[in-house]
């Protein structure tokens, strides 16, 4: 069996009432870009800084459990979760397998160059951000591509050609940067979702790559 640990990046108690959760969520996702633009002017104050650091703390917790086999730490996610899976694999050498679906936060600053499409969260909707050099520097600093360079473990990446949330060009930016053992599953018809078959194949892949 597996130990499964699913994270919620905002530190919210999953037991709070749905109405309260929805109210807080609206606050995190306001009309000015929401939490993904919070602190973007300063890379040391950017909201996602504590999220990225939290990935390492999650692995600290998992590897402290007596049920852990002492060998394997697989990270998996889609969209923002796909981004965090790659980031975790790049930050922490305890990670042994990485699976990511259509990772967000990839090639974010591409919109600043004429004719290029950037990744989610699509800061092109907030033109002032793209005019701010400090914001662009922070985007580049936290971009998934930077962490993909540091990944050394087997990685399984999937994306679809009809995805307009995380465009396929941004997944290719990640794929082309990965220098580790890697495998891709391209699903041309897919938008921003995965099929049950894809999810199953990912679990098979993880099982095949477990350290015995």
Regions found by a protein language model. Give the residues of each.
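Cap/lid segment of the alpha/beta-hydrolase catalytic domain
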Residues: 3-53, 110, 116-117
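Gly/Ser-rich "nucleophile elbow"/oxyanion-hole loop immediately N-terminal to the catalytic nucleophile
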Residues: 34-79
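Hydrolase active-site cap/lid region
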Residues: 82, 86-131, 186, 194-197
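Active-site nucleophile elbow and catalytic-triad environment of alpha/beta-hydrolase enzymes
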Residues: 131-147
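Short beta-strand/loop motif that positions the catalytic acidic residue
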Residues: 150-151, 157-159
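Short alpha-helix in the alpha/beta-hydrolase fold that links the catalytic acid
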Residues: 153, 167-176
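Acidic catalytic loop of the alpha/beta-hydrolase fold
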Residues: 161-166, 192-193
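C-terminal catalytic histidine-bearing segment of alpha/beta-hydrolase fold enzymes
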Residues: 172-212
